[in-house]
């Protein structure tokens, strides 16, 4: 067997190690050493590969841990918040399975929402404490919580989620246009008639007895009514071919992008949008919406002013434009408040109308009684005085808002200093708190054993009794479709009128039932139509 000697590259020199003689290796030993070296490298690679999931697990454990200083409340399992990744369960189903019992027993729970553990409240006295103490439980929307996110890019800093002097500035400018005593009902009736025309045409095209989807028409109606009542714009979404009014068509895209469970519950992922093509597109859509809306509004108003055309009535858009032009609002503040008017003034109505078609479509007794009351007026041109005098119509709208609150859950307040909610729940500063309106409204301890039933009669017999209970339950924190106290929705009067006018026209001209394959799905902030069809027969 031949021996070999491993020498350094430098010729004619003997390589001397610091210790021992020059290295001599037998060929067999050499290959064995190489094998050992490869095995060591393989093990090292395996260790590295194993450390990656371990590091991820450790990071998630840190990211998802409940801060030690949060109150000792029942904790809703983290996975409940991300069920949408693999489950089609609606929020009403999720509430019944995981939230109802702890919330009704304790009044508040810890829940994972928008990238952090927050406190969700449903007990009325706790809600009242939170609503009344605006300086302690300050409004803080996505622009404060997750300012880098897609949703923050969409809504920005606006009259709904701002606080302090900024909120006072916005309210001083916008309140007269949002809380008018006498809204013009002509646009409401005009668009409601067009809406009924469109769904009847769709039904005739589909054939009698065949179900049709109405959500597209509902959104078009809601956008058109919003435009004519708040922005001095007739977008004509109902009149023009579907999808040609960009400001309306883009709303469906926005809704789909906002409520993707992964990004909704892990908004930190939006900070890596440069790696995620779908999030890049989401940011583009949000910017397109804001830029298009601002250009459309200013273009219309400037054109009218150049022609000497004065608006028929002062709307919130005119107040915003004046404040922007005289420097009270920055361009961003102007745009953010335009967007929030557009979004809330159409989406809440849209979701409530979807719920209306669902509930009244499967409740023939209510539909028949309501139609009889409407037809008894002997008019086809209802005014605000006419619809506001109808007790059953009023009760139906109130009950729809109770069982189907358009904003079913919202966590957009933060403690500015350590707090003691209801004098019993200690909350550290910087904790986000919110409410679940659906949970409040279906609590049998508040609304009785029939809390889950659609029962308009619970509101009373006369319009006066109904208004009194509406106010009483709102003050108590037991009825919160429009929030309560100083931050209650400024547009609630308009929403009630809008719904009554639409219901009047729909019930006057249409009878309908719900298609057996249709399903209503409840999302964290509103209701959306889910698979299935709605049958509408004239």
UniProtKB/Swiss-Prot annotation:
Topology of the protein relative to the lipid bilayer: Single-pass membrane protein
Gene3D superfamilies documented for this protein: Cytochrome P450 (1.10.630.10)
Record bears the keyword Iron: yes
EC number: 1.14.-.-
UniProt record, GO biological process: biosynthetic process
Pfam families per record: p450
Predominant location category: membrane
GO CC annotation: membrane
Positions in coiled-coil regions: none
Highest taxon of the lineage: Eukaryota
Compartment annotation: Membrane
Glycosylation sites: 378
Transmembrane segments: 44-64
Keyword Iron (UniProt): yes
Annotated metabolic or biological route of this protein: Secondary metabolite biosynthesis
Cofactor: heme
Enzyme class: oxidoreductase
Keywords of the record: Glycoprotein, Iron, Membrane, Metal-binding, Oxidoreductase, Transmembrane, Transmembrane helix
Binding site for heme: 489
GO molecular function: heme binding; iron ion binding; monooxygenase activity; oxidoreductase activity, acting on paired donors, with incorporation or reduction of molecular oxygen
UniProt record similarity statement: Belongs to the cytochrome P450 family.
Record's function text: Cytochrome P450 monooxygenase; part of the gene cluster that mediates the biosynthesis of the isocyanide xanthocillin and its derivatives. The first step of the pathway consists in the conversion of tyrosine into a vinyl-isonitrile intermediate by the isocyanide synthase xanB. Subsequent oxidative dimerization of this intermediate to form xanthocillin may involve the cytochrome P450 monooxygenase xanG, whose expression is coregulated with that of XanB.
Protein name: Cytochrome P450 monooxygenase xanG
Lineage: Eukaryota, Fungi, Dikarya, Ascomycota, Pezizomycotina
């Amino acid at each position: 067997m031949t021996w070999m000697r491993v020498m350094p590259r430098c010729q004619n020199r003997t390589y001397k190690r610091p210790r021992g003689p020059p290295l001599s290796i037998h060929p067999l030993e050499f290959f064995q050493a190489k094998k050992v070296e490869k095995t060591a490298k393989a093990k090292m690679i395996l260790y590295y590969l194993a450390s990656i999931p371990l590091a991820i697990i450790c990071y998630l454990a840190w990211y998802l841990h409940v801060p030690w200083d949060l109150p000792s409340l029942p904790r809703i399992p983290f996975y409940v918040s991300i069920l949408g990744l693999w489950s089609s369960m609606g929020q009403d189903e999720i509430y019944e399975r995981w939230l109802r019992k702890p919330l009704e027993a304790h009044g508040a729970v810890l829940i994972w929402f928008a990238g952090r553990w927050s406190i969700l409240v449903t007990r009325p006295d706790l809600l009242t404490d939170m609503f009344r103490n605006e300086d302690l439980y300050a409004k803080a929307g996505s622009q404060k919580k997750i300012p880098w996110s897609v949703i923050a890019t969409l809504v920005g800093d606006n009259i709904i989620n701002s606080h302090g002097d900024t909120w006072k500035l916005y309210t001083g400018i916008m309140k007269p246009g949002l809380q008018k005593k006498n809204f013009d009902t002509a646009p409401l009736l005009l668009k409601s008639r067009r809406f009924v025309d469109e769904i009847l045409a769709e039904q005739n095209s589909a054939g009698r007895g065949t179900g049709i989807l109405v959500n597209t028409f509902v959104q078009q109606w809601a956008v058109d009514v919003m435009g004519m009542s708040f922005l001095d714009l007739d977008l004509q979404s109902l009149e023009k071919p579907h999808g040609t009014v960009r400001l309306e068509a883009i709303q469906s895209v926005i809704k789909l992008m906002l409520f993707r469970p992964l990004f909704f519950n892990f908004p930190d992922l939006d900070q890596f949008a440069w790696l995620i093509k779908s999030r890049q597109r989401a940011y583009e859509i949000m910017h397109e919406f804001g830029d298009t809306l601002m250009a459309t509004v200013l273009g219309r108003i400037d054109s009218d002013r150049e022609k000497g055309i004065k608006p028929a009535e002062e709307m919130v858009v005119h107040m915003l434009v004046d404040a922007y032009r005289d420097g009270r609002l920055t361009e961003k503040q102007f745009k953010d408040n335009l967007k929030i008017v557009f979004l809330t003034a159409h989406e809440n109505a849209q979701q409530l109308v979807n719920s209306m078609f669902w509930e009244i479509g499967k409740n023939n007794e209510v539909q028949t009684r309501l139609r009889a009351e409407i037809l008894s007026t002997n008019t086809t041109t209802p005014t605000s005085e006419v619809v506001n005098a109808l007790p059953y119509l009023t009760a139906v709208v109130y009950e729809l808002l109770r069982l189907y609150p358009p904003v079913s859950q919202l966590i957009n307040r933060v403690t500015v200093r350590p707090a003691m909610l209801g004098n019993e729940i200690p909350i550290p500063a910087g904790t986000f708190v919110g409410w679940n309106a659906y949970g409040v409204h279906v609590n049998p301890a508040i609304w009785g054993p029939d809390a889950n039933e659609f029962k308009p009669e619970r509101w009373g017999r006369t319009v006066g009794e109904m208004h009194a209970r509406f106010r009483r339950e709102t003050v108590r924190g037991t009825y919160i479709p429009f929030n309560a106290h100083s931050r209650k929705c400024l547009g609630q009067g308009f929403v009630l009128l809008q719904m009554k006018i639409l219901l009047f026209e729909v019930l006057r001209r249409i009878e309908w039932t719900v298609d057996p394959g249709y399903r209503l799905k409840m999302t964290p902030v509103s209701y959306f139509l889910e698979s299935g069809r709605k049958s509408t027969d004239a």
